[in-house]
Amino acid sequence: MAFTDTSAISGLVQTAYDRYVEFALRSQPMIRAVADKKPVQQAMPGSSVVFSLYNDLSAATSTLTETTDPDAVALSNVDTVSVTLAEYGNAALVTRKLQLFSLSDVDPAVADIIAYNLADSLDVVAQNVLRQGTNVIYGGTRTSTATITASDTIDSADLRKVVAKLRSNKAVPRAGSLYWVGIHPEVSHDLRAESGSIGWRDTHSHTDASLGNLFAGTIGTYEGAFFVENARMFSAKDGADQTALATTAVTVAGTSAGFTFGVASSAVIATRAEVGDKISGTGIASTAKITAISTSGSTTTFTVDVANTAAVTATTVVTVTPVTRVFRTILCGKQALAEAVAQEPGVVIGPVTDKLMRFRPIGWYGVLGWSRYREEALYRIETGSSIAAL
């Protein structure tokens, strides 16, 4: 019996595609909203903007003498904070051929991606300034970033300490009597998992009408602060070394002065190593850290940040030492961060200037900058996370 099936008329059997293309998962930019100090009476355009702060007089506690004219006192000079302006931007060049051949309309997608890149990029730049504040406490009993381990997690005492310091510094709260906290979800997990009466307790919903409109992502108020949970809060593999993973042999050699070598994709280090971990072995530079990991078939390729000192031969035994990821939780009051803008960032549709009008530019551009304005209104808590390695 002969069937007229999909094999018989295979030319009519095609793969179908969904023309709706999803975007990558995104976190919501939020740091620019913290920059609430901006120029009020800027004198002129310039490459930088200087803010000035008066200093108060010392308290006059001595009594006056009835017949003696008190001595005048001179006011101290103002303190200044400078914000250096810089150009920021990015661009894409879409070809006419892509527009004609694409199964999905790319123009709206490119516009959306460019717009998000604008907000995302500037938020990273602003956070890089904010997270460098001079006031910092470390999880557990640690005294530096490099000594923090995964067990040095955040606790309520850390928050009480920082809120007390902010109030002692006379920092102005950001919402009612509450300070702002930017916290990573993996740090928030540890805080809310604290057990007993000292743990995450008596929290209030961020919908409390008396607090006004708080930040998107607010998860509650606690210990004198309101918490904004966001995965974009900075973390880095710059804590203490952890226990080394099981060693394994190289299967794809790396050249001298090269930056790569390969191991079996089934090896422990192939499945558990992360970018930022240390890696060592004959021919690998002593300070090498992993910058990229890619797997293709049975081989996992490691890229390191320092060139190999010699050939990394096949069968060379390598060791990966995981480095603790340290999370930065930021607490601040008003005027912790200043922002100055010469041109507000925005999307730019560039002119089509090629001879055949095939190349269509779209990008974003802005001229602005940030600086910490009141250090006394800014604190940072550096901790590990109990779930960072999961």
Feature roles, as predicted:
Residues D5, G346-L390:
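Extended, compositionally biased alpha-helical segments that mediate assembly or anchoring
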Residues F51, N77-G139, A171-V187, D354-V367:
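Long, contiguous amphipathic alpha-helices that act as assembly "spine/axial" helices in icosahedral shell
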Residues A59-S62, S102, D190-A193, W200, ...:
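Short helix/loop capping segments that flank catalytic or ligand/cofactor-binding pockets
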Residues V136-E223:
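Extended, solvent-exposed, turn-rich assembly/linker loops in the middle of proteins
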Residues H204, R232, D238-A273, S280-I330:
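Small/polar beta-strand repeat architecture
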